[in-house]
């Protein structure tokens, strides 16, 4: 797979999964902007050395990368990142929004600051990034956007107490993916998402793991960012070197919104009586 001549922005790329994505893309020939605010595990604070160190590490290997330290929770910060990519490499073909954080807060203790950080990085940031990247992506011969979701949000089976802020943000990115995959289709911009599992500092892991390695997720993300990927609106679940793709699809025979082609009920009592049928549809 060859990314020579293509330019990618990877957010949250100073460490963990994002660094693995950036390193693989750069190794495959891409120009890469490594963006990272250097926040802690709860999305607070900042350390400008994180992105710069990651960029220098790859530059020392002869790869074409630049570092970017900025606050992507603001519209202005996202615009500056896109402009950084254009200034450095003259084009933009790939946008990978990986930045995020995992924090637990019971619902009865939910507060605006905690929720706000989740909303910023998971909703505002991808929207603002796409807003400013869009005009450049439209000129690319193979424009790709990769957002980030989580099985902890998508599947009740994997949900955990205290993850309301995290789950809300990760599910929001699926809505953004669906909307932008439709908006991008006429101009050739493909929008997908990855739902990764990897042992990183978010898990409190500081040493190289023996399994669930971040670098084992990277090939899937590289594919979504590549010219070989021809699909849009998919979620790529990636864990331990294994991959499965899924997306939201409608039931056969539906004429939305006038006919769901399923169980009819005219009262709450009928809904209750036919609930077993309804939930199996």
Q: What residue ranges belong to the model's regions?
A:
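Catalytic loop of short-chain dehydrogenase/reductase
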Residues: 138, 144-172, 177-178, 182-186, ...
């Amino acid at each position: 797979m060859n990314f020579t001549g293509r330019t990618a922005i990877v957010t949250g790329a100073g460490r963990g999964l994002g660094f693995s994505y950036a390193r693989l893309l750069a190794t495959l020939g891409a120009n890469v902007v490594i963006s990272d605010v250097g926040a802690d595990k709860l999305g607070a604070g900042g350390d400008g050395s994180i992105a710069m160190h990651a960029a220098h590490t790859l530059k020392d290997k002869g790869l074409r990368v630049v570092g970017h330290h900025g606050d992507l929770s603001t519209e202005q910060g996202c615009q500056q990142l896109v402009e950084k990519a254009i200034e450095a490499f003259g084009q933009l073909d790939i946008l990978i929004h990986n930045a995020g954080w995992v924090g637990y807060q019971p619902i009865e203790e939910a507060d605006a600051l905690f929720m706000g950080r989740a909303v910023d990085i998971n909703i505002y940031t991808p929207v603002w990034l796409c807003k400013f990247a869009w005009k450049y992506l439209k000129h690319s011969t193979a424009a790709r956007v990769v957002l980030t979701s989580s099985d902890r949000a998508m599947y009740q089976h994997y949900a955990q107490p205290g993850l309301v802020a995290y789950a809300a943000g990760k599910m929001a990115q699926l809505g953004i993916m669906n909307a932008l995959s439709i908006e991008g289709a006429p101009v050739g911009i493909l929008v997908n998402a990855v739902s990764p599992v990897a042992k990183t500092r978010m898990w409190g892991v500081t040493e190289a793991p023996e399994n669930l390695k971040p670098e084992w997720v990277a090939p899937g993300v590289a594919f979504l960012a590549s010219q070989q990927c021809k699909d849009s609106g998919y979620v790529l679940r990636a864990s331990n070197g294994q991959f499965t793709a899924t997306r939201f699809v409608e039931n056969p025979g539906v004429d939305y919104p006038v006919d769901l082609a399923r169980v009819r009920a005219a009262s709450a009592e009928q809904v209750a009586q036919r609930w077993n049928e309804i939930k199996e549809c």
